[in-house]
Design a protein with these regions (language model features):
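C-terminal cap/substrate-recognition subdomain and adjoining C-terminal extension
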Residues: 68-177
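Active-site neighborhood of HAD-like aspartate-dependent phosphohydrolases
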Residues: 1-44
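Substrate-recognition element of Asp-dependent hydrolases with the DxDx(T/V) motif
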Residues: 42-67
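Short His-Asn-centered micro-motif
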Residues: 5, 52-55, 114-116
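Acidic-and-aromatic substrate-binding clefts and catalytic sites of carbohydrate-active enzymes
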Residues: 28-29, 58-62, 89-92
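Short coil/turn segments at beta-strand junctions that form active-site/ligand-binding loops
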Residues: 1, 45-47, 107-110
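Short catalytic/ligand-binding loop motif for oxyanion handling, primarily in non-cytosolic enzymes
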Residues: 12-14, 58-62, 119-124, 139
Length: 177
């Protein structure tokens, strides 16, 4: 089981980020309360953490700079660790990076995506996506949903997502006579 983890909007909330940025104290951009909630998911499911955040550029199988080290330090306090990260592919969406990870790890069947933003998830990924409220970050409701998804109870996916509809309409407008 795998957790694809975004950082901003998941392991922090807007107030927490604002306070850290105001003080220019980037070491506090990860909220310990949110890490405790993440630990709950890991303990219940035995999942491994895959960093899918833009913070991944600071973490290359080892933290490569202070931001990567902060990620590791924040997680280590709770007995957690990043095991891998999604590939950083130039001009690719987060959705494409997660797809690339899954193609390179075909044995991964059970996974959840914790992210506050819609990155154009395709239908398969959308059913594994638990969207956090970026203003709130990870909360008890998202934790329960994530555990449920990891246990095989996938998220309902509308027949056509907003993203899919936008792409379809855009193509129709461009290619229609």
């Amino acid at each position: 089981m795998y957790i694809f983890l975004d950082i901003d909007g998941v392991l922090n909330d807007s107030q927490f980020r604002w306070e850290g940025l105001q003080r220019q104290d980037y070491s506090v951009l990860i909220d310990p309360k949110k890490v405790e909630l993440l630990k709950k998911i890991v303990e219940e499911t035995g999942s491994r953490i895959v960093l899918s955040s833009s913070w991944g550029k600071f973490w290359a199988n080892n933290p490569v700079d202070s931001a990567g080290k902060r990620i590791d330090a924040a997680l280590e306090k709770y007995g957690l660790a990043v095991s891998e990260k999604t590939p950083q592919i130039r001009n690719a969406t987060r959705s494409q990076e997660i797809e690339a990870f899954l193609q390179n790890h075909p044995y991964v069947v059970s996974y959840v995506i914790l992210d506050d933003n819609d990155h154009g998830w395709n239908r398969r990924l959308r059913s594994h996506w638990v969207q956090t409220n970026g203003s709130v970050g990870l909360d008890e409701e998202a934790v329960a949903l994530a555990i449920d998804v990891l246990r095989g109870n996938l998220m309902p996916v509308p027949k056509e997502t907003v993203w899919e509809r936008m792409k379809r309409v855009w193509k129709e407008r461009i290619y229609s006579p």
